[in-house]
Design a protein with these regions (language model features):
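Active-site histidine-anchored catalytic micro-motif
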Residues: 2-187
Length: 187
């Protein structure tokens, strides 16, 4: 019977927040290079990365970065969820408090988000995102122009002889300003 390898692995967690400024009501912003930069800076070789939008009117999607196709995406979203329709959410006189003082009539943006998604999880192999040839990771603004936050969270797997702790690195304000934080061992 062949000998089985039961090597234990440790997991290193790294997180960062990307601050993203948007300029258009519907805008596709390619985050792929910034995510690859985070992988390099945090020495993520093998594992997964989750890209998460902290908003209900900004989505995360993987697709092709071709200008005409992106215009088709925008047109589809506008046709499915037009801004000029009457929506219950936009009737501030009927809304339950609390209502933000700068609340926008943006039901169409929330409906578009429902068709997309809040996050994507991508495998990382040999330090690179395991994306297909044409795949790119987008933050999709649905209610711009705004300031947005996108979380990048990596789980990197290491054999025990390389790493014996789980290290959580938190970065506020963008890539490149890493500060080491809580370290704890995994069972």
């Amino acid at each position: 019977m062949p000998e089985q390898n039961h090597a234990r692995h440790s997991v290193v967690l790294s997180e960062t927040i990307l601050n993203v400024s948007t300029a258009e009501p519907i805008q596709f912003i390619d985050l792929t290079d910034r995510i690859n930069q985070h992988l390099t800076e945090n020495e993520v070789e093998n594992g997964t990365v989750t890209v998460f939008s902290r908003h209900t009117t900004a989505a995360i999607k993987i697709n092709e970065a071709e200008d005409l196709l992106i215009e088709d995406f925008k047109n589809m979203l506008r046709e499915l969820c037009p801004s000029g329709r009457t929506y219950n959410h936009n009737d501030m006189s009927r809304r339950q408090p609390p209502i933000a003082p700068d609340e926008r009539p943006n039901a169409h943006s929330h409906l578009m988000h429902l068709l997309l998604s809040t996050s994507e999880t991508i495998p990382v192999i040999d330090g690179r995102l395991a994306l297909g040839t044409w795949q790119r990771i987008f933050m999709v603004e649905l209610d711009g122009a705004r300031q947005r936050q996108v979380m990048i969270r990596c789980e990197s797997y290491h054999p025990h002889e390389k790493a014996e702790t789980v290290e959580l690195r938190a970065v506020e304000g963008g890539i490149g300003r890493s500060s080491a934080a809580n370290q704890r061992a995994l069972p």
